[in-house]
Amino acid sequence: MTDRIVPATLVFREDGTVVSPLYGDIYHSAAGALAQADHVFIRGNGLPERWRHERAFTIIETGFGTGCNFLATWAAWRADPSHCERLHFVSVEKHPFAREDLRRAAAHIVAYTTITTITPIAPLVDELANAWPALTPGVHRLEFDDGRVTLTLVFGDALDVLPNLALRAHAFYLDGFAPSKNADLWSPAIFKSLAKLADERATFATYTSSGAVKRALDEAGFAYRKVDGFAGKRAMLVGEFAPRWRVRRHEPPRAFSTDRRDAIVIGAGLAGCAVVERLAARGWHVTLIERRERIASEASGNPAGVFHPMIARDDNLAARLSRAGFLHALHRWRALERAGHAFSRSTHGLVQLATSDDEFERMRESIDALGVPAELASALSRDDARALLRTDVAHGGWLFAQGGSISPATLAAAQCAAAGDRLSRIVGVEIARLERGGDGRWRALDASGATIAQASVVVVANAADAARIAGLRHAPTQRVRGQLTLLPPGSAPAVPLPVIGDGYVVPLANGVTLTGATYEPDDTDATPREAGHRENLERLERLLPAFSANALDAGALAGRVGFRCVASDRLPLVGELGDEAAAAREAAALTGARLRDVPRATGLYGAFGYGSRGLVWAALGAELIAAQIDGEPWPLERELAEAIDPARFLVRALRHGRVA
């Protein structure tokens, strides 16, 4: 991948401490990892007292290691009856442990702890290990205690990933290996990156008191002081963010300011229902408005859709976004299922077949070169694909062990059910435009000008109509017709799991097979056509040679038409919308603007342009919007968030002098 992850090696010393052979240093003191975490990092940052005054509290750690600092902090949060509503723990790790090594290391440390905690920590170890993500570069968000404790893991070199984070930190745990063993993690560049993320009242703590670290802290705007170290160590450092000069051009993100936590979501498809669930989980009261009589009636009403990540040899933006979206969606869906909100999905994997032998070689070489873990994707020879699919195939491909198919409508229903009584629905009503009143609240108006609903926040998630309703001129999207075909039982090879390539085939209940889909830009015909069925049959024949397209009467087949919303750069539009009117007034000053310089339509967000990847992108997009609204750490790198920022087209227009 961008920089493949090299896992840590688990080694125990005779005294029971965990040691890194790579750095030649221990992960924790022989006097006890949990006691060290409590003394140095929790107490060193004035916790738990400080988080009692915040709705949400964010901690950044440099070096996740065995996870003991997180486990100790989580246990302290659980034990505090006055704890903050939501605890965010963000940790950067260049060499994460594999799942079972992490479980062994943390369990060993807990078993030999020298302190007694109110909250048992051993069960937390299992929860952490069970949720542990695939070792792929980037951001991985895990949730515990019904989402009230969030662990955001960032796998990669801190020098590279810290400047790419978007969050506001209240406390820093500086916990790399000793400066003499891993100087990069204590360099001035690290502290300058942390300073750009610090809240005005942020604190830090670290076990070291080296002169180089003190100088780097001072240069970055942190005031430090020495205090007694842990287990007889003479000194450690604690302190506050207290810059004597301006150290950053842009302030870190803040929560949307409002006295009323209510929101409107327009569009009840995959995008909108995912946003509903994420906002409701944070205590927002949401009004969902859908122009049809029921949710998931348009493209999200297809019998099934496939979900899998993209893999590209250059690990481009689209591939990274799809990987992040895929892994995040799996995490969210499992959480829904654990909460009793079931929906229909296959869990036996998905196969992507090459269209030629040369393409198969490129596919195989890609996952080898990128170091893709087998739990994400593995190469599948032609013979292996034949055996797995129980039918002939022309070429090998990839097996996505966690990919599959899903019923979008059942997922949307589960997300709405999870929102519970925080959700109100208005169906059969079409919104014509949005208007922000003098009180700062948004109103959703119908064609007659009547107010259908009002709220502090609005999220437009109604595909190709979103830009029109939000009044956007610089959000180029296109409607693309897609026709799928339903094949009767016994008329197609009975593959046991979804297959994609040039088209797709999905086994449904009762022996019915779904195949498709056509791709017809700017075609608005919602009626299935014989020509579309014929195209799908021919595509299926190329995918599975045992099938004959001529064996069926295309004119007698059933099917369905949906419309994708596709942006001109094929990436979705997710996040706070730009204020185009304000940008026009300031156009002369914004010709060289970056996305963070663009004026925003306060309280107005978008989640649209997902194309054919709504299942992969909707959950991550919803989490990003909820995080932006509540001022939480973003669930993906800033570079990726900017790639899908709805205002990116406005910035391009400003640079070319096309905004007036």
Swiss-Prot record:
Its EC number is 2.1.1.61, 1.5.-.-. Residues 266-660 are annotated as: FAD-dependent cmnm(5)s(2)U34 oxidoreductase. It comes from the Bacteria. Keywords: Cytoplasm, FAD, Flavoprotein, Methyltransferase, Multifunctional enzyme, Oxidoreductase, S-adenosyl-L-methionine, Transferase, tRNA processing. Residues 1-242 are annotated as: tRNA (mnm(5)s(2)U34)-methyltransferase. PANTHER family: SARCOSINE DEHYDROGENASE-RELATED, TRNA 5-METHYLAMINOMETHYL-2-THIOURIDINE BIOSYNTHESIS BIFUNCTIONAL PROTEIN MNMC. In the N-terminal section; belongs to the methyltransferase superfamily. tRNA (mnm(5)s(2)U34)-methyltransferase family. In the C-terminal section; belongs to the DAO family. NCBIfam families: MnmC_Cterm, PRK01747.1-2, PRK01747.1-4, tRNA_MNMC2. Catalyzes the last two steps in the biosynthesis of 5-methylaminomethyl-2-thiouridine (mnm(5)s(2)U) at the wobble position (U34) in tRNA. Catalyzes the FAD-dependent demodification of cmnm(5)s(2)U34 to nm(5)s(2)U34, followed by the transfer of a methyl group from S-adenosyl-L-methionine to nm(5)s(2)U34, to form mnm(5)s(2)U34. This is tRNA 5-methylaminomethyl-2-thiouridine biosynthesis bifunctional protein MnmC.
